[in-house]
C-alpha cells in the first residue's frame, strides 16, 4: 500500500498531478491518500517526487528508489515513463521519420513486415481526430468515460499530444497483433532516446475497432485494423527524477 513520508513531503502536488488513478488528494494538512482510489503501482509518483517521500508498505526505501545500472540501454529501458501531459511543441519531423526507418529493423513473423503507420501530425490534426472519436462515443455510448472526462478538461484519448503514431495491419497476415506491437515498442524506445515523451493510446485502438469511420479517417484499408497507437511529443511539466521499482521477472527455467 502506498503512503507518504510526511517529514520528507513538501506538498508540491507533483504526485497528485501525475497519478493516473487519482490516488493522491490535497487534505487539510497536505497531500493525502484518497481512501477510495486503487493504486496500480505504476510508481509515477515515486519517479517524480523531488524529495523521495513516496513509500510502499511492502517495500524498503532502497527498493522503491533503486540505482540505475549505468549501462545506457538498460538505463533507457528502466527510465522510460508514460507521459500524459504534452506541450504544443512539435517534434522534428526528420527525427521521427529517422526513428521510423530504424524501427523497420524490428523482427516480424516470416519477415512479412505487414503493418503500416499513420502519423497524425500537428495539434490541430490530433484534436480533429479526437473530436471525431468523441462525437461517435457520445452518440453510440462507446467508452462513455471519454467524453465525460473531456468535458471536465481531461483528455484520455490523446493527452494533448501534438503527434500520434497509429499502427495498423491486415487481419489475414501472419501476426496481425504481435508484429505491430514489437515494432511500436522498439520505435518508442528510439523516440524516448531522442528526448521525446510517449504514451500508448489504448483508447484510440478501442474506438477505431468500433467505428469504421475512424479507420477510414486514419487511412486504414478494408480488412485491416488499428493494432496500437502512440502519443508522441515533449513532456509538459513532467520530470521523472528517480528510477523506480519493478518486480523481478516471473520466469520458469526448464533445464537439464
Q: What are the roles of these predicted feature ranges?
A:
Residues 1-256:
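Acidic, surface-exposed loops and disordered segments
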Amino acid at each position: 500500500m502506498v503512503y507518504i513520508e510526511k517529514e520528507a513531503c513538501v506538498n508540491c502536488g507533483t504526485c497528485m498531478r501525475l497519478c493516473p488513478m487519482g490516488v493522491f488528494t490535497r487534505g487539510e494538512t497536505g497531500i493525502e491518500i484518497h481512501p477510495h482510489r486503487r493504486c496500480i503501482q505504476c510508481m509515477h509518483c515515486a519517479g517524480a517526487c523531488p524529495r523521495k517521500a513516496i513509500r510502499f508498505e511492502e517495500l524498503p526505501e532502497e527498493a522503491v528508489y533503486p540505482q540505475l545500472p549505468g549501462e545506457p540501454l538498460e538505463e533507457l529501458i528502466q527510465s522510460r515513463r508514460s507521459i500524459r501531459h504534452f506541450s504544443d511543441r512539435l517534434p522534428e519531423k526528420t527525427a521521427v521519420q529517422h526513428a521510423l526507418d530504424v524501427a523497420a529493423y524490428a523482427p516480424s513473423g516470416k519477415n512479412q513486415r505487414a503493418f503500416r503507420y499513420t502519423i497524425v501530425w500537428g495539434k490541430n490534426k490530433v484534436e480533429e481526430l479526437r473530436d471525431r472519436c468523441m462525437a461517435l462515443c457520445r452518440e453510440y455510448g462507446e467508452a462513455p468515460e471519454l467524453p465525460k472526462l473531456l468535458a471536465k478538461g481531461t483528455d484520455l484519448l490523446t493527452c494533448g499530444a501534438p503527434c500520434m503514431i497509429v499502427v495498423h495491419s491486415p487481419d489475414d497476415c501472419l501476426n496481425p497483433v504481435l508484429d505491430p506491437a514489437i515494432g511500436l515498442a522498439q520505435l518508442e524506445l528510439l523516440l524516448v532516446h531522442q528526448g521525446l515523451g510517449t504514451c500508448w493510446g489504448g483508447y484510440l485502438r478501442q474506438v477505431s475497432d468500433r467505428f469504421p469511420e475512424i479507420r477510414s479517417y486514419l487511412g486504414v484499408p478494408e480488412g485491416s485494423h488499428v493494432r496500437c497507437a502512440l502519443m508522441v511529443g515533449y513532456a509538459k511539466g513532467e520530470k521523472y527524477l528517480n528510477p523506480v521499482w519493478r518486480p523481478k521477472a516471473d520466469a520458469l527455467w526448464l533445464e537439464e
